[in-house]
Amino acid sequence: TGIRNLGSAIIGQPELEIFVIVTHSHWDHIQGFPFFTPIYQPNRPVHMFPTLHKKNVVLASLIDQMDGAHFPITPDQVPSNFNFVTENPLEFLESNGFHLEMVPMNHPGKAFGYKITIEDKIICYFTDNEIDPPYAKSIELDKLTEQCRNADILIHDAQYIETDMPLKHGWGHSLISQVTELGKAAEVKNLVYYHHDPERSDDDIDAELEKASKVLKEKDSSVIPYFAYEGLRLTL
């Protein structure tokens, strides 16, 4: 849903091409798309990737919500140039300077994280992942750790704390403490805790950042922790 603010930030750069790659089709990950203002700019190139998840399911979720009943503007009224990349999407991204690897996440309904390499920088975007779920795992912790080994940035789901359990065990999200251990074990450079529980206040989040920083310092880790907030920018 943060894509709305991103749209406002780049609306004055019509030359930028946009690549839309979605992790999964749960509401909180698709609802912002109709409010993404660049899609209302005539001739703005927008590349959509329907086959990186279940074929056409995520694309349908993005587009079908703009049906006139749930949103007043329908897809045929959108003036930007949608390019639905259905053939060799990974090769298409490679030709545009992005090496992208799909990584299965542990999440109800299935989801994918993405490991993106641009030049010599590695960014792992692992949202909606339950590190230790009660259901069958799509990825084991050792494999997850290797996927983000030495990443410049790891952005990882960190919605819960120990007091949320056992009620929310199996809901598809990780404990903050688990993410701290993952970042340390993988020796990532920057660790961004993401997907905060909406019930947590800014003070709560600041307190969790202080705890995570203390744990990493006590274990002599060089990982730099951040708790994501709107407008956060990291320069590599």
Predicted regions and their residues:
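Cap/insert and terminal regions of metallo-dependent hydrolase folds
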Residues: 133-224
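Active-site glycine-centered loops adjacent to acidic/histidine catalytic or metal-binding residues
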Residues: 24, 128, 195
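Thr-Gly-centered strand-to-loop micro-motif
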Residues: 126-127, 156
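Binuclear metal-dependent hydrolase catalytic cores
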Residues: 1-124, 132-135, 145, 205-236
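A broadly conserved detector of short glycine/acidic/proline-rich loop/turn motifs that flank catalytic sites
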Residues: 129, 160, 231
